[in-house]
Amino acid sequence: MGLSDIPANYMQQTGHNLQQQQLHHHHHHNHNHNHNAAAAAAAAAHVLAMENSELLMSPKDKMSSKKKMHLLKKIKKRFGLVRRSPSSCPGPNNLPPLQFHTVHGDNIRISRDGTLARRFESFCRAITFSARPVRINERICVKFAEISNNWNGGIRFGFTSNDPASLEGALPKYACPDLTNRPGFWAKALHEQYCEKDNILYYYVNNAGDVIYGINNEEKGVILSGIDTRGLLWTVIDIYGNCTGIEFLDARIYMYQQQQQQQQQQQQQLQQQQLPQQQLPQQQQQLPQQQLTAHHPLQQSRRSLPGGTGVVVDHELERHVMPSLQSLHLAGTAAGIIEHDLANGLPPLRYNANGRLIPVPFHITKGRNVRLSHDRFVASRTESDFCQGYVFTARPIRIGEKLIVQVLKTEQMYVGALALGLTSCNPALLQPNDLPNDSDFLLDRPEYWVVSKDIAAAPQRGDEIAFFVAPNGEVSISKNNGPAVVVMHVDQSLQLWAFLDVYGSTQSLRMFRQQLPNMVAYPSQPQINAAAAAAAAAASTTAASSRMLPMAESLNSLNAGQMLRSKMQLNVTQSSSTLASTAGNGSRMISMPSNGDILQIQPNGGGTVLVVNLPPRSSSHDLNGQLAGRQAASAATVTSSGILAGACSSGTLISTTSSQQYIEPVAQSTSTLNGTKWKDSLSDQQSTDSSAECTICYENPIDSVLYMCGHMCMCYDCAIEQWRGVGGGQCPLCRAVIRDVIRTYTT
């Protein structure tokens, strides 16, 4: 097809040549801008007036006004009043076709009137330029004419503000990074998967300096930014790797062909819609309505409002509210999640479908190469990059909470896989520049970071990786419901956010969580009366077993450094069903698994997570708490974070620095363990901790601090040996890499 085959109304008419347009643009920019704005406003008003008058015409007048409306359409296109289709050229189409410049690499041969460039001998020294400067928003179409399987990699393309004529005899081997390290050159590598024979690459630079590219008329997004558009720009292409020949296409012809194909497809779809509905299967007619009702039960009622008002849909409401309603609607049953996945083309959960699964949204803080879905449930890395795929959980994780990561898409061309990490850093405080390309460098940050790379070897689409943090700090991972493997240890007393690095072969994923068995919420500063609590406990003994504990000594935070006493009591009852209560503002979540061995306090507003191993219960427990009162003083233990947690044979006392409250687990009627053994083991542990002996040699006192984790568990000599390679140079408690050893002195 040539330019003569394109209708005249497709071309934009111009009365000046290219040089006159550029000269006029540079010297009379402001005048033309104001003149065009006024002309566009006048034309728009005239068009609207004629369209309104057409509605009042008779049928004969309408037939005679077709020519006028045809003229109006031309005016609309001329002044930009018609919305362009994605395939239409966004820039001027009255420019001559692009050709290759005579200045090029040593291994380049130009033919076909300067439109075809081939690379001979080797894989480098193949830099080419356009023969003329390109305009802003001018679409450049490149066809991959020849492909070789003897090389790897894809072409490099971009722009330069340097005249190629000034580079004759001074071209380097490669465009990236030889040219891009010089001022005035911008280029990026195209992914090798797009470099296939007869594929057509298009790209252009806009006024903001962003380079948008696409393949086969399908836009992929921005690949380059920061182009200086104040001067002339030439396109630069390095025919590198598996591509050995490229051809410049006339953008006008290519875009016209794409428009014709789209029009034909639209006509075919319109003809199919006009077929009698009796010929369509009944299931096919009912399927869209069933899907609409199943996935968005509120959407149908909003669209079917009387008076036609339901036709206008608030897109922002659908964009933000409907995904949340949908997740709430589907969170209760696994069948609802499977139905939703099948409707959206996502692989259903196969290995962890049992139980109550809740989709987990990702935090808005992410790596620069990650795209989140509108509901933030799906994270996808851009196809042209393999790193900077960080995503964080929107809230801190809870101890014992099972998180399930499902792989939605993979790309086997990349090496490496998904990485998992935990951090005490709030993602809201991070900037995109704070995240490195290699997740190992996160360990150099001042916050607490732990990372494990390649947690799933060679992941496939549909694989499910489940992980959770145990009360002892072990992080266990299982793939496809297989045996769990401990991959790292963390400081479980910290408030931790989980993060993933969508790296290497992993392209897209989403996350679910299984709700903990029992959740109790209580206000941060409750008003509790001892007499009222005792009366309430006596009244509730017939329904559930309960008990109260008196006051115990507690230490304030290390910053205050003084002893406080409190006589506040909190009565916690346990029934056979799941415990749940409504909390007000500033509430905290208490997680109590059904076995009653672990108690976890999760502050919603931030702070330290307190995890307590509950003591065994005895059937001869005193409900009045007299035994607890006698043993409370000897059972108190001060934690390193400044929070007091006491445990004894009769119960557990918990005190926080903010509210100074006591949380007590409920006694069970039967127990297979002996409370005396718990008391003895606790006393032994306290005596061991008080001696502060090195955990390696058990001879010298602890006199060193490990940097960066901050643990004090070894003497200085053992810490130096551990740091220099014995044990892998890791902290024996949290397995963090030891960066330095700091010696401490006591007086």
UniProtKB/Swiss-Prot annotation:
Keyword Electron transport (UniProt): no
Swiss-Prot/TrEMBL keywords: Developmental protein, Differentiation, DNA-binding, Metal-binding, Neurogenesis, Nucleus, Repeat, Zinc, Zinc-finger
Low complexity bias locations: 280-292
PANTHER family recorded: NEURALIZED, PROTEIN NEURALIZED
Residue ranges annotated for the NHR domain, each copy included: 97-251, 359-514
SMART domains for the chain: NEUZ (SM00588), RING (SM00184)
Gene3D superfamilies given in the database record: 2.60.120.920, Zinc/RING finger domain, C3HC4 (zinc finger)
Listed GO CC annotations: endosome; nucleus; perinuclear region of cytoplasm; plasma membrane
Lineage: Eukaryota, Metazoa, Ecdysozoa, Arthropoda, Hexapoda
Described function: Involved in neurogenesis. Interacts with other neurogenic proteins in the specification of the neuroblast versus epidermoblast cell fate.
Cystine pairings recorded for this chain: none
Cell compartments where the protein resides: Nucleus
Signal peptide as annotated in the record: none
InterPro entries: B30.2/SPRY_sf, Neuralized, NHR_dom, Znf_RING, Znf_RING/FYVE/PHD
Name of the protein described by the UniProt record: Protein neuralized
Region described as Disordered: 280-309
Zinc finger (RING-type) boundaries: 694-735
Main subcellular location of this protein, as a coarse class: nucleus
GO molecular function, one term: zinc ion binding
One GO BP: long-term memory
Pfam families per the UniProt record, alphabetical: Neuralized (PF07177), zf-C3HC4_3 (PF13920)
